[in-house]
Amino acid sequence: MGGCSTRGKRPSALSLLLLLLLSGIAASALPLESGPTGQDSVQDATGGRRTGLLTFLAWWHEWASQDSSSTAFEGGTPELSKRQERPPLQQPPHRDKKPCKNFFWKTFSSCK
């Protein structure tokens, strides 16, 4: 509302939320350590998925932070300046409303 733009902060907050969500999903998908230990191939596949997920999240976080830093150097977004240039929306004049009619045989009221 003021002169500050919160657009640059949204990608980092969104990336943190996505990071928490995906790390929770990845942690719940991992096998428990107290289970059978003879499943080396399953653990290798899980480790590969985890590495791929972490690589993707690191890339995505870097991309989101580059996006937010580039908008900070541009001097704001053009949409914000267009909004500030427009006059505020004018509301139509308030009309006198008739009182609502309550129809006892129906389940609704009629307001015109």
Swiss-Prot record:
Residues 28-81 form a propeptide. Residues 66-101 are annotated as: Disordered. Residues 1-27 form the signal peptide. InterPro entries: Somatostatin, Somatostatin/Cortistatin_C. One of its GO terms (cellular component) is extracellular space. This is Cortistatin. One of its GO terms (molecular function) is neuropeptide hormone activity. It is found in: Secreted. It holds the Pfam family Somatostatin. PANTHER family: CORTISTATIN, SOMATOSTATIN. One of its GO terms (biological process) is regulation of circadian sleep/wake cycle, sleep. Interneurons in the cerebral cortex and hippocampus. Disulfide bonds join C100-C111.
